[in-house]
Amino acid sequence: MADAVLEARELGVRRGHCAIFRGLGISLAPGDLLQVMGPNGAGKTSLLRVLSSLMPPAEGDLYWRGRAVRAGDPDYLAQVAYLGHVNGIYPDLSAFENLQFAARMAGQQPDADAMHHALARFGLDRVADAPARTLSQGQRRRVALSRLALTPRALWLLDEPLTSLDDASTDCFHTLLAEHLQRGGIAVVATHQRLPAEGAVLDLATDAGSP
């Protein structure tokens, strides 16, 4: 068994004065997928934000390759691709320009061929030059997911990635995720819908400690 790369020990998250969960442990090695499930309010999004280091836990510690991670840790963030409920695309930029901007923000030289290929995989080649504000919610989600193929990050943290996707785009996402895991990447996916990929399932309603 490969050594753990991402570890969470005795994690606890609070909302105001109320504990959402506590005592949570996670240990993930290269190629691992963790599906996080649970009803609304169970803390799925909060857990992803803690794992992204965007929010400190109320309790416990997070480790990456054996080193403690603190909120906003730049070295850790360079390994993370985080996709939340909000797609994070700019409405006045085209789909293609959004990918260009994301590449530059990641410190990469934009590769036009790779960007066109990423958009085409999600069926966006015909709207690549259209302003994002003219796209449907499903198309905007697909633009956001296209970024994952362009910025190689070891850890994917995805919050309901299948939202607004049609069947073809859902299949494309499953393929993209499988490729990431086969390369030794790690993924933590909050979802209401079980993914077909092999991996552990964490149900925050039953598997995480509560007050």
Curated annotation (Swiss-Prot):
Q: Which keywords accompany this UniProt record?
A: ATP-binding, Cell inner membrane, Cell membrane, Cytochrome c-type biogenesis, Membrane, Nucleotide-binding, Plasmid, Translocase, Transport
In this entry, which stretches build a coiled coil?
none
Q: Which residues form the ABC transporter domain?
A: 6-208
Return the EC number: 7.6.2.5
Q: Does the keyword Cell inner membrane apply?
A: yes
Query: Which top-level enzyme class is recorded in the Swiss-Prot or TrEMBL entry?
Result: translocase
Q: Which GO terms describe its molecular function?
A: ABC-type heme transporter activity; ATP binding; ATP hydrolysis activity
Localization: Cell inner membrane
Write out the transmembrane intervals: none
Q: Which InterPro entries match?
A: AAA+_ATPase, ABC_transporter-like_ATP-bd, ABC_transporter-like_CS, ABC_transptr_haem_export_CcmA, P-loop_NTPase
Q: Name any one Pfam family assigned in the record.
A: ABC_tran
Q: Does the keyword Hydrolase apply?
A: no
Could you state one GO biological process linked to this protein? cytochrome complex assembly
Question: Which annotated residues bind ATP?
Answer: 38-45
Membrane topology for this entry?
Peripheral membrane protein
Give the CC-aspect GO terms. Answer: plasma membrane
Record's catalysed reaction(s): heme b(in) + ATP + H2O = heme b(out) + ADP + phosphate + H(+)
What SUPFAM superfamilies does this protein map onto? P-loop containing nucleoside triphosphate hydrolases (SSF52540)
Q: Please give the function described in this protein's UniProt entry.
A: Part of the ABC transporter complex CcmAB involved in the biogenesis of c-type cytochromes; once thought to export heme, this seems not to be the case, but its exact role is uncertain. Responsible for energy coupling to the transport system.
Assembly, in brief, is: The complex is composed of two ATP-binding proteins (CcmA) and two transmembrane proteins (CcmB).
Protein name according to UniProt: Cytochrome c biogenesis ATP-binding export protein CcmA 2
Organismal lineage: Bacteria, Pseudomonadati, Pseudomonadota, Betaproteobacteria, Burkholderiales
